[in-house]
A protein has these predicted regions:
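A short SAM/SAH-binding and catalytic strip from SAM-dependent methyltransferases
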Residues: 53-67, 90
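Class I SAM-dependent methyltransferase SAM/SAH-binding core
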Residues: 1-45
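A short acidic, Gly/Pro-enriched loop at the edge of an enzyme's catalytic core
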Residues: 43-54
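A short glycine-rich, Lys/Arg-flanked "PGG" loop and its adjoining helix->strand segment in the class I
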Residues: 68-83
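Core SAM-dependent methyltransferase catalytic element
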Residues: 140, 146-171
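C-terminal alpha-helical "lid/dimerization" subdomain adjacent to the S-adenosyl-L-methionine
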Residues: 3-4, 87-146, 152
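A short hydrophobic/small-residue beta-strand
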Residues: 15, 84-85, 150
């Protein structure tokens, strides 16, 4: 919906938002009319190599059928020295908190969502996809395997979310 794109644009950067979902792009265009949106498959981006200073995906990589391929495509379209950033649900580091969180995600979230949402199944998918997603070190390894340099992450909200970044190497 362009939420992270809007924040980046407010910081003074030129932004081109893309999404696979026409519905998400329509909502994004409504919410962020000043940002251009392009329909794109994350695993086959319609941009030339080395086109952007950065590529950012927020809460979307987990939903791509081939997330490693999408991450590779993000790196491909970023100029050497540029940044690839992924903001995604992750794994709380504190063991007790992780246990409580996992029980909430798999137990309560789908149940509560089915009571208040017309699409309760989406919340079951959300819970399952979060728990199946690699932890912080696992996603960091993906960055390194793709050749991104200085791959690192920062936990947000106790590790419920992690912000990963890596840099495209200079040739």
């Amino acid at each position: 919906t362009g939420t992270s794109s809007a924040a980046i644009a407010r910081a003074g950067h030129r932004v081109l938002a893309s999404d696979f979902s026409a519905g998400m792009m329509a909502e994004g265009r409504k919410r962020q009319p000043h940002i251009p949106f392009v329909g794109a498959d994350a695993t086959n981006l319609p941009f030339t190599s080395d086109s952007f200073d950065a590529a950012v995906i927020s809460f979307g990589l987990r939903n791509v059928v081939e997330p490693r391929k999408a991450l590779s495509e993000m790196a491909r379209v970023v100029k050497p020295g540029g940044t690839v950033v992924v903001c995604e649900f992750s794994t709380p580091k504190n063991r007790a908190f992780r246990h409580i969180y996992s029980r909430y995600i798999m137990g309560m979230l789908p149940h509560v969502a089915s009571q208040v949402s017309a699409n309760g199944a989406a919340y079951s998918y959300l819970a399952e996809s979060i728990l199946a997603w690699p932890d912080q070190e696992g996603l960091r390894e993906w960055f390194l395997e793709l050749g991104l340099e200085r791959a690192q992450y920062r936990n947000l909200s106790g590790g419920i979310v992690a912000l990963h970044r890596g840099y495209v190497p200079h040739a």
